[in-house]
Amino acid sequence: MGRKQKSKQGIPPTLEENHNSSHKVTENAKKRKHSKEKPQNSRKRQLAEEKKSLFENSDSENEKDLIDADEFEEAETLSDLEHDEEPQTFADEFIDDEAKECEGEEEDSVFDSDEEHEVKPMFSDDSGDEEDLELANMEAMSRKLDEEAELEEKEAEEELHTNIHPEAPTVLPPIDGFTDSQPISTLPQDLSQIQLRIQEIVRVLNDFKNLCEPGRNRSEYVDQLLNDICAYYGYSRFLAEKLFELFSVSEAVEFFEANEMPRPVTIRTNTLKTQRRELAQALINRGVNLEPIGKWSKVGLQVFESQVPIGATPEYLAGHYILQAASSFLPVMALAPQPNERILDMSSAPGGKVTYVAALQKNTGIIFANDSNKARTKALSANIHRLGVRNAIVCNYDGRKFPNEVIGGFDRVLLDAPCSGTGVIYKDQSVKTNKSERDFDTLSHLQRQLLLSAIDSVNADSKTGGFIVYSTCSITVDEDEAVIQYALKKRPNVKLVSTGLEFGREGFTRFREKRFHPSLKLTRRYYPHVHNIDGFFVAKLKKISDKIPTVNVADDMKDGTNNDVEIEKNSTEIDNITFNDEADKEIIEQNRRKWLKSKGYKVAKKKD
C-alpha cells in the first residue's frame, strides 16, 4: 500500500475516483514530458523564460508543483490499493510506470529557487557580457578608423612631398616633329585623347615651373592647347586665339566647353495681361516644370521640361508670355524706362526688348521700335500685337540716320547693336569658322556709328531721362569696351554711369596693350560658364549736355577726366551732326589692306 494509505483509516476510494485520479496523473506526466523534450531555440529565449518564471510566476508555479506532487502521491496510494485487490492490466502497468517516472521528476521539479538558481539582477551577467562585447567591438572599430585616418594622412603627406617635384607629363610632340613611326600631323585624331591632352596642358600651364618639360617654353604649350581646342571644339585658329585671350587658361577651356551646351529655356511674363504667379500656376497645370529665373528678375521663368510645346500653349497665343533669353532682360533693366517717356529702340526685332519696355511703361508714353531689316519687322509687329502693346510705332530706318534724317529728342535710347554673336555660339555653330578679322573690324565700325547716333538722339535736358544703353551679345573687346572708349572720345558730353544690375563682372579697364578709361569698370560682362546665360555686354551712359565741348579730348582722355568736363561757352550745337566720311574711308581702307596681307596678298604701298 502507498505511503499515505498506511497512515489513513476509512473506506477506500471508489473505482471512478481512482480512474479520474489516474487520468489526471497521466495528463500531468505527458505535459511534463513534452516540456522536457521541447528544444530550446536560443540562449536569449531561455534567459527570457527564466526571468519571466522567476519574477512573475515563481510563486504560483511552486504552488502548482506542490499540488501536483500531492496528487501524484494520492494516485500512487490508489494504485497500491488496486494492486492488492486485482491484477494489473497492461495499461495499468503502463500508467504505473509513467506515474513512477513522474514521481521522480516531480520530486526533482520542486526545488528552492534560492538554492539552485540565483536571482539575476535587472542587467544580467549575460547581458553584461553582450554589452562588454559590443563595447569591445566599438573600441576595435574606433581603433581601426583611427588607424585608417592616420594611414590616409600619412599617404596624403607623402603625396604632398611627392608633388613638390612632380613628374612632368609628356603632352607636347617631340622637338623633331616625329614619333617612333610617323609624323604627328598624320596621326589619327582621337577626341578622347585630345580632351585628355587639353586637361594635362591646362594642369601644366597652371603650375608651369614644376610641371613643364625640360627645354620647353610656355608658348609651345599654349600653341598646342590652341591647336587642340580648334580640333576638339571646331573653332578657327583666329577666333580661338581671340576668345582665348579674354580668360585665364582654365577659364578659357570652361568657356569653350560651355559653348557646347544650350542655355536654359526662359520665358518672360507679360505683365500687361497677367502676373507671374498666375502664369506659373496655369503652365504647371498644363504639365510644365518651371521656377522663377532668379531674384534679379521679377518677370522671368525658367522652363525645365514641358509636356506641351511651350511656344504653342493657349497662354502663349493669348500673349501672356514670350520666349526670351534671360540675357535680353538685362539691357531693358539697365535702361529702366519710366511712364510717359519717349523711347527709341534702334534695333528692336524680334520684339522681346521693346515689349518689355512697354510693359514697364504700362502702355504709356511712346516707343519707336525701329529695325533696319524690313523682313524682321514682320515678326516685330506680330509680337507687339500678340502681347497687347499699344504705345509702340514700328519703323524701318537705318539707325545711323537718327536724329538728323528721322527724329531725335528721346528721353532714353536702347541700342542692342548688331554683333558677331560670340556670346551665343551654341545657337549658331557656324560662328566658330565663318568669322574673320575683317568681319570684326566692319562690325566694330558700324557699332561706333550707331552708338554716336544713339547719343545724339537723346535729349540731355529730359527731366526723367537722358540715358543711353549699349549692349551686344558678343564678348570681344573690339565690340564692347573699345566701342565705348571711342564714344567717350568723340562725345565728351556723355559719361558712364552704373547699370544698376545686381550681378555681372566689371568691364575691362585694360586689356593686353590697350588701356581704357577707368569708368569702364561700371560696364558689365556676362559669360555662359559663369552666369549660365548668353555671353553679353551692357553699358549705360548719361548725356550731360546737348553741346559738344571744344576741348583737347586726347589730352583729356590721358587724365581720365573727360566725363566730368565743364561745358564751355564756345560750344557748337548738334543741329547738323555728320560723320567724318573721309576718316571712315581711311579706316575701311586700312582694314582692307590688313586683311589682304593676312591672306598672303602683296599690297602696294600707300601713296602719299
UniProtKB/Swiss-Prot annotation:
Keyword RNA-binding among UniProt keywords: yes
Annotated residues for binding of S-adenosyl-L-methionine: 347-353, 371, 398, 416
Protein family per UniProt: Belongs to the class I-like SAM-binding methyltransferase superfamily. RsmB/NOP family.
Domain of life, per lineage: Eukaryota
Keywords assigned: Methyltransferase, Nucleus, Phosphoprotein, Ribosome biogenesis, RNA-binding, S-adenosyl-L-methionine, Transferase
PROSITE patterns linked to this entry: NOL1_NOP2_SUN (PS01153), SAM_MT_RSMB_NOP (PS51686)
GO CC field: nucleolus; nucleus
EC number(s) from the headed UniProt entry: 2.1.1.-
Keyword match Lipid biosynthesis: no
Residues modified as Phosphoserine: 58, 60
Matches recorded under InterPro entries: MeTrfase_RsmB-F_NOP2_cat, MeTrfase_RsmB-F_NOP2_dom, Nop2p, RCMT, RCMT_NOP2, RsmB-like_ferredoxin, RsmB/NOL1/NOP2-like_CS, SAM-dependent_MTases_sf
Enzyme class at the top of the EC tree: transferase
Compositionally biased region (Basic and acidic residues): 16-29
Protein name: 25S rRNA (cytosine-C(5))-methyltransferase nop2
Organism: Schizosaccharomyces pombe (strain 972 / ATCC 24843)
Active site: 473
Bias kind Acidic residues: ranges: 68-116, 147-158
